[in-house]
C-alpha cells in the first residue's frame, strides 16, 4: 500500500495515485479498474478531462469500498464564481456517482477573471456541509496563494503543480512547506521526456527498476504526492511497485542536474483559457 501524507486539515492522502489526464473516456474505466486491482487507493480526475463518468463507474464496480478510495476531481475555469462552483460541483459528483469528494481542486487560478477567491469560498461552504473532505488548488503561484489565504483565511490543503526533474519547483515547494500546503505533482514523469534520459536509465539499471519507477521514487523521497498516468495495466502496476527501494544521495544529486526550469505545460500566470 502507498504511504500517506497528512494534510493540514488532518485528513490523509495516499502519496501515489493514478491520474487520468488525457486518458480517453473509453480507456479510463479499464485504467481505473486496473489501478484499484493493483492496490492504488487514490484516483485523480477533473471535469475538463471528460472522463468522470467512467472513473466513477470503475470505482462502483471495483468491489473496493468507497470510503477506502481517495477521490479527487477539479473545477474547470469556466465554472469559477460562487454560484457556478456549487452547480459544477453537483454536476461532477453526479457524473462520478458519489455523494462526497475527498479532495476538490480549483484547476487553474485564471488570474484575469479574478474569481478564484469566491470559488474557494464556495469550496469552504461545501466542505462545511460535509460534501468535500479537503479543499485545495492546482497551478497556483505564490501570489495566488497569498491572495487566497488573505481573502478567505483558509490555507489550501494541496497545490497540484507541474513538477518533474526538469522543473523541480524548489521555490514554490519552499512556500508550500512554510504554509503547510502539500505539494502534488502533475506530469511527474515529464510527459515521458525523461524516460530515455541517460541519467535516469543509468540509475534505473543500478536499482533493477524502470525509469518511470525511479522518477516516481524521486517524488516520494522529496515528499511530493504523485499521480502518474497510464492506460496499460502492466505499467499501472509497475508504477505502484516503488516502495521496496530507495534512491541514494548521489542518485538525487544526479537527478537534480537535469533541471532546466522550463515548463512543458502552460504558465499559470498567463493561462486564462475558459473554453
Curated annotation (Swiss-Prot):
Keyword Isomerase: no
Superkingdom to which the source organism belongs: Bacteria
Residues binding NADPH: 189, 227, 229-231, 235, 238-239
E.C. number(s) listed in UniProt: 1.1.1.-
GO molecular function annotation: aldo-keto reductase (NADPH) activity
Active site (catalytic residues): 49 (proton donor)
Keywords attached to this entry: Isopeptide bond, NADP, Oxidoreductase, Ubl conjugation
Keyword Ubl conjugation: yes
Protein name: Aldo-keto reductase MSMEG_2408/MSMEI_2347
